[in-house]
């Protein structure tokens, strides 16, 4: 008799996705981040659900409701910090997942890659709106500054910003709608993840060599289920270390001060995972130019497949591209550091140089390096 997992309509889908899935035998730990992102999403949805049971999205009570969660709700402090630091782990995994995709040429799976970019935008939007909800100083001023950027759009900008705010400033209406969107978006993300996986399973996974692996596939279970389980343990360990020993390490002390529209904090900055984009935004003195650069810093990912000039898919055997890739990583770390610094000399210049370098590497230097490597192949 055939196993039920191969015949049952629902179990059959799970079987083809997680059990009998033919997987390349040589995929490294860099391929663990997909499942880790799935785990992060589950953690965020569950902790978020329990937080939403106690949170109130009203300007008068939002801050005190978060305080109430931390002080009076059973293990509320744990749920709150798991959620806040879970977002940080989410972005660490996201950036590593995208970096893996660039390094090993996974972007040649166009549908999977493009849905991944949409997912990245959706997760960033969710995280931004979530940061507004505790209604601390950085919540309020972060929301004011970032939403205000839309006013740079010609003709419709001001009307658009006031429409998003639901008034003439960030206020009760803004907080309520941000809570509504913050609640619904993770479920939209979960649906997009399914589509992301659907397209991935149409082609099968890439592998470090970038060479088709049809001749050497192994079943996902038990080989990669056990490998993913190890990744889960490492992620949970790191998250718990962060939550239980220094829960506020990645947060901003200003967010422990209730929102006050009459008092601007000296340095308005977003959470650490947005600092690289914030640095790119600030490096351009023009408002509209800065907004375009900010959007392009992520949208540039969509252009990468069009600029693939190499005869090899992966960077595994391409030393010049490898050097450029790691320079890009160092550049992103530099931008992250600059984003958290005040707007003064020498940080302004460093930020501008790092921003130019970021776009230059992706749009000019990497395609050129690939062409040079193609020539070297013929020697």
Swiss-Prot record:
The chain crosses the membrane at residues 33-53, 77-98, 113-133, 178-198, 226-246, 288-308, 320-340, 347-367. Heme b b566 binds at residues 97, 196. Gene3D superfamilies: Cytochrome Bc1 Complex, Chain C. GO terms for biological process: mitochondrial electron transport, ubiquinol to cytochrome c. Binds 2 heme b groups non-covalently. Its cofactor is heme b. PANTHER family: CYTOCHROME B. Belongs to the cytochrome b family. This is Cytochrome b.
């Amino acid at each position: 008799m055939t196993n039920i997992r191969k015949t049952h309509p629902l179990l059959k889908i799970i079987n083809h996705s997680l059990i009998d899935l033919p997987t390349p035998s040589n995929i490294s730990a860099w391929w663990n981040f997909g499942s880790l992102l799935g785990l992060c999403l589950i953690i965020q949805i569950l902790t978020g659900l329990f937080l939403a049971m106690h949170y109130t999205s009203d300007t008068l009570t939002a801050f005190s409701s978060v305080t109430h969660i931390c002080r009076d709700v059973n293990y509320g402090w744990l749920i709150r910090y798991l959620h806040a630091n879970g977002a940080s782990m989410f972005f660490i995994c996201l950036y590593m997942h995208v970096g893996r995709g660039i390094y090993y040429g996974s972007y040649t799976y166009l549908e999977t890659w493009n849905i991944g970019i949409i997912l990245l935008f959706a997760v960033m939007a969710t995280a931004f709106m979530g940061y507004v909800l505790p209604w601390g100083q950085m919540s309020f001023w972060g929301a004011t500054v970032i939403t205000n950027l839309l006013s740079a759009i010609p003709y419709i900008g001001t009307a658009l910003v006031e429409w998003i705010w639901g008034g003439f400033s960030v206020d009760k209406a803004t907080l309520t709608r941000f809570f509504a969107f913050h609640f619904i978006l993770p479920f939209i993300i979960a649906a997009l993840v399914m589509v992301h996986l659907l397209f991935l399973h149409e082609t099968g996974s890439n592998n470090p060599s970038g060479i088709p692996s049809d001749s050497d596939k192994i079943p996902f279970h038990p080989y990669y289920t056990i490998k993913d389980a190890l990744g889960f343990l490492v992620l949970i360990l790191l998250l718990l270390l962060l939550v239980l020993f220094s829960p506020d390490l990645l947060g901003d002390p200003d967010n422990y001060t209730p929102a006050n529209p009459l008092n601007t904090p000296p340095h308005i900055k977003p959470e650490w995972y947005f600092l690289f984009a914030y640095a790119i935004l600030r490096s351009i003195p023009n408002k509209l130019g800065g907004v375009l650069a900010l959007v392009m810093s992520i949208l540039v990912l969509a252009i990468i497949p069009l600029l693939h000039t190499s005869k090899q898919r992966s960077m595994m055997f391409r030393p010049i591209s490898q050097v450029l890739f790691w320079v890009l990583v160092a550049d992103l770390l530099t931008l992250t550091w600059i984003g958290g610094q005040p707007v003064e000399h020498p940080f302004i210049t460093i930020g501008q140089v790092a921003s130019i370098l970021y776009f230059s590497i992706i749009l000019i230097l990497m395609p050129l390096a690939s062409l040079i490597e193609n020539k070297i192949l013929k020697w």
